[in-house]
């Protein structure tokens, strides 16, 4: 009996092993395609997903997987199509079936495309880093293991600025969107003057616009008198015509123009503001009326500057989206850890108590000195996790995305990854990027980042969006550290001296350091500084 049990156990083990082996799918063998890409549902997204997969399989193996539709699937095929509701919008399921097929099903929108990206990245060794910058290992045979992988994005909308977005594959790879993808006529922020242009309505109807210092003031940056019923009627007429021109799109922004303390202070508006404890109350009352008038549409509005804090009483309807902006916050530590950030966190937590439809516009950019060091990599993950925790469903990270900006490629890489999954290891993301993008120079540039980060925190000097290198000349950009940074860049360049592509990337990444040196060098030396130096010398 004991031998029988051992024999049965061995048979079960062999069966399990054989099942595991048979669950593998070979796409290419000895340079020849052995699989097909089958479109279960023929639509634009699935076709784009199929083409992306076909393209990269060919780059890896030189073999072309045929794309077919309206045909019976067979063993070894990759099936693109089908619904996986649990994955959510843009999510997907990769699953090896009992018929030895790989099913890529979608939770909606671009889920099938993102499923292909995950397949290429996680199981076929393709890594994408920046515009037209990727790595792969050529293979004559491509075999996939048994797969069961479901992913749901942390946010339904993910956006960042980057020159890399000019590469259509990059944009898909990092699962990024643009306002034009979501918002009707690209109307996603500061839209009051687009909906009711003051040039058109201001002369005849000045009462539509903010009452400030005793008079209504039409203008490109003026706000609306939100308690005036004629403003609501005029806005409805304008919006109705916009919706009819774009019947297939759902979302639009009805939001204040840029500028602070420009909201209407007529007696009626002021009364609502005082009752609600914030000018946002007027906005939400107005937006709720629009949301009731057009229940099949979604309206986004700003919680920005004067309207950042939530109202005390009125609650946004489910189809009212709150775009909350943290423009006034410092960036050297996470938002939860500095005074300016705490005001924003208070607002975020307040909005999250009355809405689960929040869009956060976060800033990681230096507007005044765009080509200068901005070492905020250590706060990215904590801030994005904070947003996720507080019912944020849409996220825009406004960063310096220009070529030659402060590690702009790495910043976009990390943000793209973290907006999809905020609970990845951020330091591992940095190391992975550096190793893939900078090659043998990576250790030196990693040291550069960590030394500058530590110096920033030790200096006590805030990092903000209107910063200057000069303000850090006694801190993270002091002469001793500048010497260290340059030595690290020298070592980085030497490490890849024989590779012109990698060398060029390092030289571009050095520009912010060089810019800082030039800015600091042209700083006037004050008389007080000279006297202090003379005193120390004597």
Question: Each predicted region: which residue ranges?
Answer:
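Feature activates predominantly on carbohydrate-active enzymes
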Residues: 33-34, 44-52, 56, 85-285, ...
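Short, well-ordered secondary-structure micro-motifs within conserved domains or adaptor modules
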Residues: 66-88
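Bacterial Sec-dependent N-terminal signal peptides
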Residues: 1-24
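Structured mid-domain segments that build the active-site/substrate or prosthetic-cofactor binding neighborhood
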Residues: 342-440
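Long, charge-rich alpha-helical interaction segments
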Residues: 447-468, 472
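Substrate-binding cleft/loops of secretory-pathway carbohydrate-active enzymes
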Residues: 305-327, 372-376, 405-411
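Conserved small/polar residues in nucleotide/adenosyl-binding loops
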Residues: 528-535
